[in-house]
Swiss-Prot record:
It comes from the Archaea. InterPro entries: PQQ_b-propeller_rpt, PQQ_rpt_dom, Quinoprotein_ADH-like_sf, WD40/YVTN_repeat-like_dom_sf. Signal peptide: none annotated. PANTHER family: CELL SURFACE PROTEIN (PTHR34512), OUTER MEMBRANE PROTEIN ASSEMBLY FACTOR BAMB (PTHR34512:SF30). Keywords: Plasmid. This is Uncharacterized protein MJECL23. The lineage of its organism: Archaea, Methanobacteriati, Methanobacteriota, Methanomada group, Methanococci. Pfam families: PQQ_2. The keyword NADP does not apply.
Length: 827
């Protein structure tokens, strides 16, 4: 016993002696000390850690960078020498999970294998192989749960590796969250699933409106954080046991974060406000609206009466339909379809509002190609004040008498147009209103004939005396108030939100969130070809007959995994504009966020502040530049040989041939948009800051301030149009520094273009045309979903929306509105 005590005492004294030597460590003896006590370090981790701490302290106190680097390399070497054990998995290890320390088991995922190792020795306890790469895993009690490609979930015994159950949940899954015996999984898109961890049975599933990129569990509630195409965040709160939606926040709330504590929900918005809500009470309030709309759906009914059951087509005839709103609520008729086996008429009308318990007569011009008694179905589509849509069908019999002596070909559209134009050619000051009344429904259907009529009216204004011109001018204004400019030339439905569009000749190129790329005939809306990229299309530009795409991960902040590796790369593609044939593709080491072209140079703005330049002919990289900030680059513009881009609070100017930095300018807010006018750069920033800079030097010439972040901007002469995120559009005179006008929209401005003296806006679910000089609304068009981008070619306005809708509108109807504005001024 005495001998053992002496041994322990000597051991303690030995350690203290070593510590004393280490305390004298310096730049000349640190290697010598390591060699002297290497064997002691391998057995005593405490004393080894003490040595490493002293090395780090020494390195921090050195002014010599080369010597510090030498010590740093030395530390890496000795740390490698101190490895306790090593295991070769045969591939990239992307996930580790440790069972309770007492069980001494570590689980690791590698490609399509799962290994269980002894944490002390590194010896393999068991191995399990699945069909595809394992994406995630976790351990609960005595089971290990893993998810592998294809949406498969598997549960194993953690001690033996034996399979307990396996189930296919969705198409693809990501991550796990666990509460009691309920596992919550996401599919990487909009679906969330709840699984019983004991049996593998699906308890429920929930579909969010937007892509879910983060979920957390608090007590018995699940919080989902979603993000739309603009990066705006939405939150759902679900009941973990049933999947029932308790709360939803987004849109008008502009929520930036959400927490739940007991019965209180805490919201923070992007304007710096924090709200505390009673969770249960607010949940009840949010449920009231669906209940009300269900009640409305039950009671909104209409009656339809055919007022004329026989049509004689010796003259242009109309079919009068009487519709009665039987409910107490107002409704809006949006479409009437009259169909039989011959599909005799498919008719769109301008919206007609019918108040509760009211009746209206609607006259429809009808042009059948058959005669006799026809059984027809009349389908009326309408919506109530809650925007709930309805469709009702009525069956009638209609008798048709044809033109005497005419054959079916006499009713060809081209003959109808010819007859109508002959009538319009006889337009004069006494019959112009009568002609409009007779052919109003035809005008609603036939844009070419309506434009022909409008041009004749304009000629009448120009050739009349002032008093008569004013009368005709008033009539024109009335027509434009009645006539919907939102009747479409065509509509196309893409797969995924249409983020970008570009026009070359008669071809419209669409780039989608889903990675789909379409070429559309601008005149007909017919699809010419389709291409599928690897990821979301963030950049799109056309040079000659080459379409160049920049693609990357749809998420801004989520790390994507592939085969256990962090997926950060993007892609650039070059396609033949006429065929869609892939000319080349280039794998980029960073996710692409923007794209522009100058001559044969393709410039890509990427995540983490990188700018890359590629050769347009082969896709080879020419140069690379790294901005000071690591944020994504979403704004690129090129003038002559100067490349301009915004990254965080800085605007950079580079030589486009070499990538050399020419100058940089620091703004007071994050750069959101930019535009070039002659030798000046206009900059729109977060916080409403607007700057005018000299393009050659970066010198600040003017500074303006508006409300809200400037998301879009465009310049016409000396007028700058600013589209902001607080549902406002501003016009500035850059010479006078004055605010000319402001216009309130129904959402953030995502598309902005100028055509002659009209400003075109894409905001939320609307397209607007505004007078650039006054800000007065010329027309407004409602879309099925939020407008993401717009462009105009000749007189055709193309808009792409978040749910894949693409609309083509004829701008020709208001090409003469400047004359109309003059009439208004006279009035």
């Amino acid at each position: 016993m005495v001998m053992r005590m002496v041994f322990v005492e000597n051991k303690i004294n030995g350690v203290e002696n070593i510590r004393q030597e280490i305390d004298n460590l310096n730049v000349s003896n640190y290697k010598e000390i390591y060699d002297k006590f290497k064997n002691v370090f391998s057995k005593n981790r405490d004393i080894f850690n003490y040595y490493v701490d002293k090395l780090i302290e020494l390195m921090k106190n050195l002014d010599d960078n080369e010597l510090s680097l030498e010590i740093d390399k030395f530390m890496l070497c000795i740390l490698k020498d101190s490895i306790i054990w090593e295991f070769k998995a045969g591939g990239s290890v992307w996930d580790l999970s440790i069972k309770d320390i007492k069980d001494n088991i570590i689980i690791l995922g590698c490609s399509n294998h799962l290994f269980a190792l002894d944490i002390k020795t590194g010896n393999k306890i068991w191995e399990y192989k699945v069909e595809h790469n394992v994406d995630s895993l976790f351990i609960k009690d005595n089971i290990v749960m893993l998810e592998y490609r294809g949406g498969h979930v598997c549960v194993l015994d953690v001690m033996t590796g034996d399979k307990i159950w396996e189930s296919k949940v969705g198409e693809r899954m990501w991550g796990f969250s666990l509460k009691d015996n309920i596992v919550i999984l996401g599919d990487g898109d909009k679906y969330i699933y709840a699984i019983d961890v004991r049996t593998g049975g699906k308890l429920w599933e929930f579909e969010a409106e937007w892509c879910v990129w983060e979920l957390s569990i608090k007590d018995d509630k699940i919080i989902l954080r979603c993000e739309d195409e603009y990066g705006c965040e939405y939150f759902y709160v679900l009941d973990i046991k049933t999947g029932e939606k308790i709360l939803e926040f987004g849109g008008e709330w502009h929520v930036s974060d959400l927490l739940i504590s007991g019965d209180v929900t805490i919201l923070a918005d992007m304007w710096g406000c924090v709200y505390a809500l009673d969770t249960n009470l607010y949940s009840k309030i949010q449920r009231v609206r669906p209940q009300l709309t269900n009640i409305m759906k039950e009671i909104v009914k209409i009656d339809l009466t055919l007022l004329k059951k026989s049509l004689n087509l010796n003259e242009w005839d109309e079919l009068p339909i009487q519709i009665t709103n039987k409910s107490l609520k107002d409704i809006t008729i949006s479409k009437i379809s009259i169909i039989n086996e011959e599909d005799i008429l498919f008719k769109d009308i301008e919206p007609i509002k019918i108040r509760g318990r009211d009746t209206k007569v609607i006259n429809l011009f009808i042009n059948p190609k058959v005669k006799g008694k026809l059984p027809i179905d009349i389908v009326v589509e309408f919506e109530d004040e809650f925007n709930i849509r309805y469709k009702e069908r009525f069956t009638e019999v209609l008798t048709i008498t044809k033109f005497k002596g005419d054959n079916v070909d006499d009713m060809r559209p081209e003959k109808i147009d010819k007859i109508l134009k002959q009538e319009i050619d006889n337009l004069n000051t006494s019959n112009y209103k009568e002609i409009y009344s007779r052919f109003k429904n035809i005008f609603n259907e036939n844009r070419a004939v309506f434009n022909y009529y409008m041009n004749k009216l304009i000629e009448l204004v120009n050739n009349s005396n002032d008093e008569l011109a004013i009368n005709v001018g008033k009539f024109i204004l009335d027509i434009l108030g009645i006539k919907r400019v939102d009747e479409l030339l065509w509509e196309f439905r893409a797969e995924g939100g249409v983020r970008l569009l570009s026009i070359k000749g008669d071809i419209v190129i669409l780039g989608c969130v889903s990675g789909h790329v379409y070429a559309i005939d601008i005149k007909t809306g017919k699809k010419l070809w389709e291409f599928k990229a690897e990821d979301t299309v963030w950049g799109l530009s056309i040079k000659d007959d080459i379409v160049v795409l920049g693609c990357g991960n749809i998420f801004e902040s989520i790390v994507m995994l592939k085969n256990g590796k962090i997926l950060e790369e993007g892609y650039a593609y070059a396609l033949d504009i006429n065929t869609g044939r892939e000319i080349w593709r280039s794998k980029i080491k960073h996710d692409v966020r923007s794209l522009s072209i100058k001559d044969d140079i393709v410039v890509l703005g990427c995540k983490k502040g990188y700018i890359l330049a590629l050769d347009i002919n082969a896709g080879n990289m020419l140069w690379e530049f790294k901005a000071k900030s690591g944020k994504s680059i979403r704004n690129l513009s090129i003038k002559n040989d100067i490349l301009l881009f915004g990254c965080d609070n800085y605007l950079y100017a580079l030589d486009i041939d070499t990538g050399r930095e020419l100058w940089r300018f620091k703004a007071e807010g994050e750069v959101k948009s930019l535009s070039i006018k002659k030798d000046n750069v206009l900059l729109g920033c977060r916080g409403g800051y607007v700057y005018l800079l000299d393009i050659n030097t970066g010198e600040k010439m003017e500074r303006f301030k508006v409300v809200g972040s400037v998301l879009r901007l465009s310049i016409k002469d000396d007028i700058v149009i600013l589209g902001c995120n607080r549902e406002c559009v501003y016009a500035l005179d850059i010479n006078a520094g004055e605010n000319l006008w402001a216009f309130k929209t129904d959402g953030d401005v995502n598309g902005l273009s100028i055509k002659n003296d009209a400003v075109l806006l894409g905001c939320d679910n609307y397209l607007y045309a505004l007078d650039i000089n006054t800000g007065e609304e010329i027309w407004k068009f409602k879309t099925e979903s939020a407008v993401l981008d717009l462009s105009i070619k000749d007189n055709i306005v193309i808009s792409g929306c978040k749910r894949g809708h693409v609309y083509a509108l004829d701008f020709n109807i208001i090409k003469n509105y400047s004359i109309i504005q003059k009439i208004k001024q006279v009035l």
